[in-house]
């Protein structure tokens, strides 16, 4: 079976590998296609696409937009036009908000005796500074044992260095993806702790605004949950997608292509996704 992975993060957001490393890794894993779905940015796609030329590996343009619906919600977008002006303007606003939040985080850390500057972090980590980078700093200063420990103790919602972010409404996320010629998909539906009834309400709400798909296979979902999501996708006439949600060493127990061993997304799902392209 030809396998694919439609949920991957690079250093353009909170992943720990470059787009070129992702392509090399995907080829080692024998994948037929991957999607670069960085958080709130499309900056990682072109380098991955270029690296894959002549290798036979398909690279799908994608994004993962953060929003909220009775709590956190993520919307994936596939086959978006990366040059869409409306999308680019909205993403620029998200970048500006992230910089403001990062500067506030640095200021909080400075008050607690950490000697660092945001400018130095951008030199070290690149223009996209995120949660794993702050976690790495906390580990280096001896405040945490590892990155996951730092995030759970200091950077999660309600913790010492957490700064709330501005979020787009879910209907706006879907609209942006559709207007950019893309296919909107609810990411990892069971991560939001919905009961079955609430999940159905979420799907119906998003479908009313143009939702086209459901991520049915994900590293954090059990076999039973993944089977149920496939039934829901069929019931609602939604396209199925799936992926590992790979972040590299940021999430060391998740492997590209298979997640924790159970993801295994068939190429036929990508073929169905392609049918929805504008």
Question: Where do the protein language model's features map onto the residues?
Answer:
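C-terminal active-site subregion of NodB/CE4 polysaccharide deacetylases
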Residues: 237-243, 248-274
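Short, Lys/Arg-enriched, disordered terminal segments
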Residues: 1-2, 275-278
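Extended substrate/RNA-proximal surfaces in nucleic-acid metabolism proteins
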Residues: 51-204, 261-276
């Amino acid at each position: 079976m030809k396998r694919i992975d439609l949920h991957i993060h690079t250093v353009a957001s909170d992943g720990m590998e470059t787009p070129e490393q992702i392509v090399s890794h995907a080829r080692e894993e024998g994948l037929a296609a991957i999607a670069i779905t960085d958080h709130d940015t499309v900056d990682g796609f072109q380098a991955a696409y270029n690296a894959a030329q002549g290798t036979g590996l398909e690279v799908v343009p994608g994004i993962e937009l953060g929003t909220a619906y009775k709590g956190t919600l993520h919307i994936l977008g596939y086959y978006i036009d990366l040059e869409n002006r409306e999308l680019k303007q909205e993403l620029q606003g998200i970048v500006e908000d992230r910089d403001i939040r990062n500067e506030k985080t640095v200021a909080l850390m400075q008050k607690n005796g950490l000697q660092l500057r945001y400018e130095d972090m951008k030199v070290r980590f690149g223009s996209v500074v995120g949660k794993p980078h702050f976690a790495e700093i906390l580990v280096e200063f001896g405040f945490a044992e590892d990155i996951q420990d730092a995030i759970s103790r200091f950077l999660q919602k309600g913790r010492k260095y957490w700064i709330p972010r501005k979020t787009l409404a879910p209907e706006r996320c879907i609209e942006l993806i559709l207007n950019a010629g893309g296919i909107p998909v609810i990411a990892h539906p069971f991560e939001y702790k919905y009961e079955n009834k609430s999940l159905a309400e979420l799907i119906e709400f998003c479908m009313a605004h143009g939702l086209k798909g459901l991520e049915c296979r994900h590293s954090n979902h059990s076999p039973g949950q993944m089977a149920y999501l496939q039934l829901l996708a069929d019931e609602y006439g939604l396209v199925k997608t799936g992926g590992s949600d790979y972040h590299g060493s940021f999430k060391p127990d998740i492997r590209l292509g298979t997640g924790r061993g159970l993801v295994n997304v068939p190429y036929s799902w990508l073929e169905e996704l392609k049918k929805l392209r504008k």
